C-alpha cells in the first residue's frame, strides 16, 4: 500500500465527533498499531509517498521517490480532498479544513469561544454539534436554503435546525461567504449579504473533490470520480477502484453515484479485494449513512430524493425526536431517514428497499410503530 499520509490507517468518522471532543484518545483512532503491519511479510505500507503515474500497459506504478513498483492487480483508493472556496483571506491563520488527523489536531488546539462553520453538510453539522458541546458559540453559514440538503428533505432539515438552535447553534442560510478579514489571523467573516461575524476561528466544510488525477494521467476513464463496472474494475485491465473516489452503478437506486461514507468504503474495499483475487462478485450493497449529533443518532438508507409520497412513523417533533420518514414511489419503498430508531426496524427497511416489495396496501402497517416491519418482506 502506497499512501501520501504519514500515519498508518486510522478511523476518520470520530475526527468530527468523539476525538474532537476529547472523548477518545489519539491511539484509539488507529485501526492497528504499526507493528501489526511491519511484522507481516505479506503487507508492506509505504508512507509519505505518492503515486505519480500508473503505466497501465506495463503494469507498473511510478512513486514520488522515483521507485517503480510492478503489479499483477492494482487498486486505486485515493478518496478525496476538501473543496476550497478560494476567497479573499482564506490563507489566514485560524481557518481550518477537516479531513485528516492532523487537521483535527490543529482544530483541537483552538481555544477561542466563537467559531463560524462554512457549510451545512455532514462535517459542518457534526463539528457544530461538537464545538457547541465544548462551549464554543457556533454559527453555521450555508449557501443553500436548508442544511443537509443532499441528505434530507426540507421538513427534516428544519426539524434538525430547530433542534440545533435549541442547543445554541446559530444559522445563516441562503447566503455564502464573501471574505475573511484579519491581521495574520482571521477575526471576522463577511457574508455575501453584508453580515459581519466576529470569530476566533473558522472551519470550511463545503464537500470534497475526488482525487482522480492519477487516473486521468494514466488514461483511466473518469467522470465525477473514477468510473467502475459492477466488479469495481476501471477502464484499465486489472486496475480496480474503491471508496469515495469510485463512481459506481448502484442497483438499489438504479443510477450511478459516488458514495462518500464509511460503510461503502469498507464494502467496496473488501469487494475489490475479492475480485482482484478472481472471485467475480458484483456490487450489490445498500449503503446506509449515519451521523451522531448531540443526543441524536440519524441514519438513512436508499434514495430519499426520488419519491411520490412519504410516511412518518413515530414522533416527528423537535421535542424528543424519535421517528422514521419512509419514502415510497409507485408503492415501493425507496429510502428512509430515521432519528433514534432501533436496529431491527432499520434492518427490515433495508431488506424492503433491496427486495422492492410492493407495500401499496400496507401503509397503515408502515405507520404503526407496534407493527413488525420484517413481516412485510415475507
What are these regions (language model features)?
Residues 342-359:
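A short, polar/charged loop-to-alpha-helix boundary motif
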Residues 3-5, 100, 120, 143, ...:
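Cofactor-binding loop segments of dinucleotide-utilizing enzymes, especially the Rossmann-like FAD-
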